């Protein structure tokens, strides 16, 4: 798609210094490691039976229906699964379709869930991590922090390229590592109807991109086949900070547009070979680091900067984008289309652990004694015509309006965490899910469909399944705990039953035995012109997939916040962390629909305190000592 020979010629003719083209691979060894050694052994994603999905489906919709509605839905499901019914035919087609596929769902899912989605990726799709503070000079110095992020990210990339990174194995089950193929040198690119993924050879594109003052710079990752030293990386970043080039117009804001609008602006940009070459470099880069000029202090300010910033000193189509503010605060944003959060959590955990272990005095000495670097950072030139200038102005205005329409709060509860929760002999994930359901019920008085992401990476090319976290048991739990006349014993009993059911459903979902992906697959098997089975036209079908709460957690001791947007206008996005001594929930919702994030935050505090009090007394009270 992109003319790289032209790109090189443009840069040779520019007034900026040029960087030698690197041709040597990262390593002279052709031996590969174990990163993908389990791939051929991974099972394929199963196709559940009609009967098990139908049974689960009815149980998941029951909390939302009165008896008459439930009987109507049962009749439609029974008609669907009966011998000779539509479900039987669709199931046979799906089984046949799946027979020769690595993963039957992957054939549809990336396009359906991500690539054909036309709303802006930020704030609606991408997710952010806000890194915890580093309590030394590294955490206060923008260039020191950015140097280490770049250095350890390049090191991680080398392990992916030579496959020496250890494959992930959880409780004896190897996980699919396919997503790591799309981690580096990759970008989402706007296209008609459905976006595409543009992937580049990492050994032929040994550079990353730095964004500073809305300008884009190309920085090498290797010299003569060797990773740059920390001192060399620092020197490049320092050069960029000292560059007198005026602040850019904010071309990165174009990536915040609706995808069709971004496509139109993108096609206009491509009319210039200069733009085509520069965009090609950004797309092909290993990753992006944005050096911001702001100084976020509170956890809310840090989260907002990582989630969206001002929308200009960014390039939202890259799957790996790091941010470092002027005061050293850092974070990460992940474009979601080819990778879920678990691979990028591993990346961030790995590099941040190394940053925390770095001795700042040794780092300063190492940088000060570094040999001179071998070239200069290249600024990527852009030819901004009047149409592009107007498009950028329009993108900035729309981005500001979109962000202003969002209401964001942070529930950062230092009262307790998984250390205490485990003493209740319950899954910490189930506990926090019930905490959020209780808070939502106290706030709205309603029980609404709730989504939790369940990883299916134990299967080849597995990504996620829906965890339907609302159940008859969780309904009983929130109703009992909201009843002033309920006894503590009843509260404990309903809590335990709801937690048990939660674990059971999430475990089944992780085993590929959820409801939503199977029903989705069956629906894809309907041929043009065929009647739509009533199970799919039943109002409860769409309602039960309307996520008034969209939730997920990630495992990290190195984040202080993470999050994303709500998925419907009158819903909440709830991203949570469960650390040993604290619980975090990032709350987002749309303004103007009667919901307020600070109100839900208050009910989260209230519910967290109540659950701790009741369960401590009901489950942890020591037996009286014998006389």
Swiss-Prot record:
Q: What class of enzyme is it?
A: transferase
The main location class comes to other
- Catalytic residues identified in the record: 336 (proton acceptor)
GO annotation terms (biological process): carnitine metabolic process; fatty acid metabolic process
The source's superkingdom equals: Eukaryota
So what does this thing catalyse? (R)-carnitine + acetyl-CoA = O-acetyl-(R)-carnitine + CoA
Q: Any idea which UniProt keywords this protein has? A: Acyltransferase, Fatty acid metabolism, Lipid metabolism, Membrane, Mitochondrion, Mitochondrion inner membrane, Peroxisome, Transferase, Transit peptide, Transport
List ligand-binding residues for (R)-carnitine.
451, 453, 464
> Where is it located?
Peroxisome; Mitochondrion inner membrane
Where does the motif Microbody targeting signal lie? 625-627
Membrane-topology annotation of the record? Peripheral membrane protein
Q: Does the keyword Transferase apply?
A: yes
Q: Which family does it belong to?
A: Belongs to the carnitine/choline acetyltransferase family.
Q: State the name under which the record lists this protein.
A: Carnitine O-acetyltransferase, mitochondrial
- This chain's source organism reads Candida tropicalis (Yeast)
Q: Gene of origin?
A: CAT2
